[in-house]
């Protein structure tokens, strides 16, 4: 029995082994191509003959796999894969791995796949087919090693980027703004460069600390040097730090001496002129260049946006130029050109004591120390860039030390072509002075003007006099002076500011010829080529330099006064501000000479108005102009001598700056006493120390004529649009007001060309008195508004002397503190309501009424009504949309059963679009309502501010500020009650002067324009005050009060 059982078991085992052997034979035929086509054994061939042959080998293979319990996809892809694998091996490539084989079969096989690495014992037979889910999961288990290898692990790669999977590098990132490759390169570079040692980093901090200490000590030494130099009266020069510095100093000193000797030769050639250049005080050095004294600082312009130092008016003549220099006095950035005819204010109003000089010295040192802190990067090259040694060396040679009372009136710097990129810009010993060069601003190109060719004469003037004759000698008579400096602190200076000092030229074509006026064409005067945007100082055709010229120079402006021996006085004010460049295209400056010939018997003067207009873009300049106006006021003192004067104003191409000069009758003088002319200038966005040029010895029986053209800012768009309805549209409006003793007339002139340019420029006309005038003559002021406004602006009438005409614009409150002087010189802003103290309440109520009538009714209410109308339209449109939507939804509910799927989707899309449209209309409606509410609140806020302030604030003009708002809007003018259209002031003789014009010019002045006019207190009668409408004032603008 045991033998039979053992034999039965043996038979069973043999049967199982036989079946396994047969399965192996069947499966091995399938693996044969992968086993490099090994020849089969003879036994296997003989046994395979017993297997029934099928018609197709493919069906036989399927049957064999089915019998063995495996399922292979019976399609052609399997055979294609095998054939491809065979071809790869035939080409000699490496044998395929398990991973590659599984990937090649996985794309078309959905059944279990036999792996080459699995032995026959591990293969499932008919009895070991997976019967449960865990077995099938184990059968389909993926090898984790292959996954890690796919991810890039397990490979020894030197590049760290290879550890990142290929899908992150091969495919672009869906995130915006992320560049994986740039990030990886940056990280790799950082790992390569960075020093992982922390000690190295702390060492860097230590080195930086040492460098900071060194610079701090250097700055302290430099700040102490000017005090020592002043105490020693310029007796010693700065020590040379190196041999090269000494050589450079000697070279510059030689150049300076050669130039000084050349000026001495010129002075000797003109003995008549040199007689007038005598030393008035022992602290001044004789000036060797005659025409420099008359025009050295007459056209000074400075780029200065931050004014953080308030100075008193009584110290203007002593420290005005010092404010222009951020550097110590021992480095005056210039050659001290001594001038005997440019004394600091020696008149009694401006004389100060020694204590005030010491106090000014302390303030000056503190100011210079603060400036030096912002210029630490320039401390290392002071002697080279700033020519500190040159000034003191020249003082040693001439034996004239610096004087504190003289300031830096005669200081200037010779700068080379502005195309140089270094900080100093000095050339190597030029043989002769080069043409006038303009330093460039940070935001504008400034190619050299008249560069590379001989500069032509910019001014021609013929004056017949007995004691003052001059002749200039070509290019040497034109000197360049500019001071360039930079700072690192925003509160001190802007990126790059430049102070440009020009001197005017005077040419005598004939030594004893009759007086003749030569007016060149302005088109010829422009030498800028296409594509250039140079900054050009105005070329003024003025009188000869006066023997006694006094200067008042402040930080942003410079005012010069010429005291002509013949009795003429010229006030020249120059101002520049880097705040705003006109966006319009280029304009060509054209000169229009409007001459009105009047008979000598009518006691009228011959007025010539030179209008410089920015017309349409021309070929000569492609950059936009931002006018920078330099204008001068000429008032003849002697009625028996009539000298022509021509003033040409060329606007600067960089900044918007406006200066205005008005004839101001003195407040404390009788009609027969000399009058006083004040020149006030304001700059947009900064505090202006006022520049006041007083004109003494001006009789009232002389005629004067002046033309001022003002172009408004481009922010007054809404008013310009409304002006179209009045018939003016974009046409330039020019108002000419002739103020005389018996009659005040207003004449309105419309421009002949439509202009869209909204810039601001002020210019003065030429004064030409061809006849002898005795007695009061009309003072003609022409104002041109190129802003697209109508001329309906109220203005009160006034007569010549003792009228009170005050046009006061709101400005920085710092102006008043700076202009208040204890001396006899009155302040400009102190006179505003000195004669109106008894009428404050009536004026206040009239002003409030005028504000309500003009701003609320004509401007703001119209805009609010328009917004309300648009809001109503949007609301009705939204309601209409809702009705349509309800109707469509009802129709859709009825026919929804018959609609197809596409029609339903289209209906849903239309519904979404309607909802979005309704939402946008609602949002627009809300915005319109909110805007209207903001306008109402703004008007109410202005009224509350106006009513909350006491009336005495009007006398001090502290109530508002002319700081430019972010939206770029300009001022909206309020009309003082005195500015009624038919207000008439009786003259001294009691006669009542009727008004010949319906409307008068109001304060349509830009925020940078500030005009002050005084009248004599003898004006006793005031007309009835009444409100008048002021049209075309934009909403949200600042206010300007106009007092008459």
Curated annotation (Swiss-Prot):
Residues 1-20, 230-251, 388-489, 583-607 are annotated as: Disordered. It comes from Homo sapiens. Residues 1-14, 460-469, 480-489 have a biased composition (Polar residues). Residues 896-937 form a coiled coil. Pfam families: KRAP_IP3R_bind, SSFA2_C. Residues 388-398 have a biased composition (Acidic residues). Keywords: Coiled coil. This is Protein ITPRID1. One of its GO terms (molecular function) is signaling receptor binding. Changing residue 105 to V: In a colorectal cancer sample; somatic mutation.
